[in-house]
């Protein structure tokens, strides 16, 4: 009563509108005000930021997922049926309609408008129910309207994916991913979010939420968020192996930030089985002058060609392909490669150089 001052209590929808419309932005603003206050009090080292993430399950139905591959398959099957229907329509109505994949929705709408005009000119009577015979005009109009309705749904799905492979109907922003807490141990996919947190001197200085399940694609946008919200750039960044990529290393070098990112193969390097695996690049000799690797059998793997790979974010990396001179009759081939031909190595020199720099930073 004291809080309301005798006024009527707000209902649940009013509270929900306040939470979604005002509270989220206000809480974020208050949070970063506190971070800036900590900076003023010299409670932050401002030397390195420690980044880690976790998965949070969304408050959404677990069984309302839509998969991009499934939508593409259904859409392709319907497109073939549309092509057959358009060919029949052109033959019967002496028209030259066509439907392309790029403008299929617009093309189907044009066909529907044409049939509606024909129905109006010929005063077509629409019938429904058992025992009624539908006219040719009605059959074609209903058919293409169904196509248009389904295509509209597929377009909605495609727009909702936003570069993802799936989304949840009851929470379109959520992505289906493996949670860290898997009590049933069945690797069930659940709708959730990837939450990233930055820590400095035991204080959380930044937090952000992402749709991507992989930490690799969250590092760069999260660092940009930290710099924008906190107001300064950290000289060094510490993260686990889930954040390692050539793109991340390149970005940190451009921003003059020192990387302390654990290599993805760091734990494998310690194992005896890895050290005895003759197929691994790390266990081969290397001649810097000739740029060749020496395999367990003493044969050279020479650079064959350089290919370019582009990540989903658009980053382009160069990969050098090395091939052994001749693996025919080699007694170690079964342990060295599964390829029918000669042994090949795919190596990004830029990535290895940047990884070594980060590894040396950790050891220092």
Feature map (PLM): residue ranges:
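Anion-binding and metal-coordination hotspots
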Residues: 3-364
């Amino acid at each position: 009563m004291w809080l309301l001052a005798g006024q009527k209590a707000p209902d649940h929808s009013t509270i929900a509108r306040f939470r979604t419309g005002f509270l989220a932005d206000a809480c974020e603003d208050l949070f970063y005000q506190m971070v800036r206050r900590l900076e003023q009090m010299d409670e932050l080292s401002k030397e390195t930021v420690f980044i880690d993430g976790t998965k949070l399950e969304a408050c959404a139905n677990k069984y309302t997922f839509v998969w991009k591959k499934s939508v593409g398959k259904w859409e392709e099957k319907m497109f073939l049926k549309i092509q057959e229907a358009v060919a029949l329509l052109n033959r019967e109505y002496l028209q030259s309609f066509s439907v392309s994949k790029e403008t299929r929705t617009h093309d189907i709408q044009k066909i529907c408008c044409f049939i509606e005009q024909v129905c109006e000119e010929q005063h077509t009577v629409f019938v429904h129910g058992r025992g009624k015979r539908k006219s040719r005009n009605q059959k074609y109009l209903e058919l293409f309207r169904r196509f248009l309705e389904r295509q509209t749904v597929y377009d909605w799905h495609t727009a909702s994916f936003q570069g993802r492979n799936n989304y949840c109907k009851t929470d379109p922003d959520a992505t289906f991913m493996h949670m860290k807490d898997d009590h049933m141990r069945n690797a069930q996919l659940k709708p959730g979010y990837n939450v990233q947190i930055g820590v400095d001197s035991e204080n959380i200085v930044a937090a952000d939420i992402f749709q991507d399940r992989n930490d690799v694609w969250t590092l760069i946008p999260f660092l940009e968020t930290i710099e924008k919200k906190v107001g300064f750039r950290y000289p060094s960044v510490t993260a686990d192996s889930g954040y390692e990529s050539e793109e991340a290393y390149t970005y940190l070098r451009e921003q003059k930030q020192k990387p302390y990112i654990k290599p993805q193969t760091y734990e494998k390097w310690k194992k005896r089985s890895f050290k005895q695996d003759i197929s691994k690049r790390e266990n081969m000799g290397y001649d810097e002058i000739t740029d060749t690797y020496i395999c367990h059998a003493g044969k050279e793997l020479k650079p064959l060609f350089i290919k370019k790979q582009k990540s989903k974010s658009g980053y382009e990396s160069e990969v050098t392909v090395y091939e052994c001179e001749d693996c025919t009759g080699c007694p170690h081939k079964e342990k060295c490669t599964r390829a029918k031909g000669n042994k090949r190595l795919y190596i990004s020199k830029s990535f290895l150089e940047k990884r070594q720099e980060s590894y040396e930073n950790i050891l220092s």
